[in-house]
């Protein structure tokens, strides 16, 4: 009797968890798929089938088949996908349901979508033997597509089954999926996005005699090695690409130059830059020049940035607002304010990037009031500020209070100091912080982003209005305007609801 009670309680808990997971997945698919592609399914049947698969996943086949057959569910592709979504990391329930669908529903035929879904789950659970067996079976059935190649290569490469990655291309070629450079490029791209660049290079080299790589192959590999910071391999591929007779690729050169600049290797980056200008100068766009100009401006080399900028304009390359903003910021950091404002006046259609360059530069040189004036003009001209705008202005006026620190004592001090301030004991709080600094512990940094986020509600609207009044009373008009503007334009759920009702009426 006690066993029966425990079993029933366990079934209830399992059912509730599966029901919650099912409802979430049902909502997800209802928003992703169009009404014309969704086949209505019985939710009770789905819950019952998932419960049986979970409880009977280790039971004999006869018992599992008996339980599933008693449900009388209608097996469709949507039903199979919903079952798979309830077991994202459990291969056994999904695989056993797949076998059941093959033996007891002969009219049901799997598609590439259902096969890929099941294959991805088995791969995520790291059952490599079953995964490899099913990957070959799907190829024999003619259900392989580009997504199948991506799933197989990603899973095998993650498990360091590199020979199988190459063999998969050979097997698929035998099944009628001929060697194709586009398919290989998509596979290499998938591996590079997962930071599996060494594995991608292995596949690339082994398949080179069967599939001739193109410009996209080399570009993807170069970008992948740059993303992981391996510039030596990226340079080797760059040279190999040149030896193969390909033109200098703009995107690959831009990525190498950008990575070198991130590592502050300016001399090497400038060599790449001038090689690109000499060989592909007529095809370079503003984004290529902007990478160099932006780095030079941020590192105080404004005169060199102006030379690159002038060369860019001589070649007739269009100058976008992001490039203008970089130059404006670079001039302001060097306190060449008049020149910076002269550039602003020369911009035909200034957008938020121009104003951000101005505000950021003025804040950098401790001109927060002037930055706030730019903020006001920005609003007058119809350019709506974003969260980053408010954060820059608040840091300019209030500074970065404290520093970030993982020390647990910092968290204790945060709570303790906050409680002292709420209690009105400001003098005691100040003395405590002074003692804290003397003992060598840093005060935690005040996070303006979290502050604005936490008060993005109706209570925050009232609070910002009151804050603006108090700040004006003590002649802090700039801060008052910033907080008042944020409170007025802040979008809350209640305001959206009221606005929708007004539009309906």
Swiss-Prot record:
The keyword Repeat applies. PPR repeats lie at residues 145-179, 180-210, 214-248, 249-279, 285-319, 320-350, 351-385. InterPro entries: Pentatricopeptide_rpt, PPR-containing_protein, TPR-like_helical_dom_sf. Keywords: Repeat. The keyword Repeat applies. Belongs to the PPR family. P subfamily. This is Putative pentatricopeptide repeat-containing protein At1g26500.
